[in-house]
């Protein structure tokens, strides 16, 4: 294969991976919608996650899973999404006035600037909870791997 073909194949793989990650994130957010989810909290959580950055962490997770045989793509995707949600939560908390007091993140106002500090704190916490819910749901078909995965995701 030529260098140009290799580059094109790599870009195609990366595009497919990013699409998979974005679709999975959107799916899990749609799962949250309903009468039991406060709309402003959900909006703040969405604001923290979309639009995303490079999504390097979930891409690395999926790439490692692929290199290891990816025998459970649902679980690998759940882990990738959870890692991104935890990363976004850390950014929300890091942007707060008590830490970096950032005005913007990813080209838009920081969550605390749009929704206020109390809701931003809850949004970051909500993303952490959501991350572990995603992993738990993704591991339903492979529960023997769930404990180790939850531990690995939790350790970062």
Locate predicted features.
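Intrinsic-disorder/low-complexity, polar/charged segments
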Residues: 1-2, 143
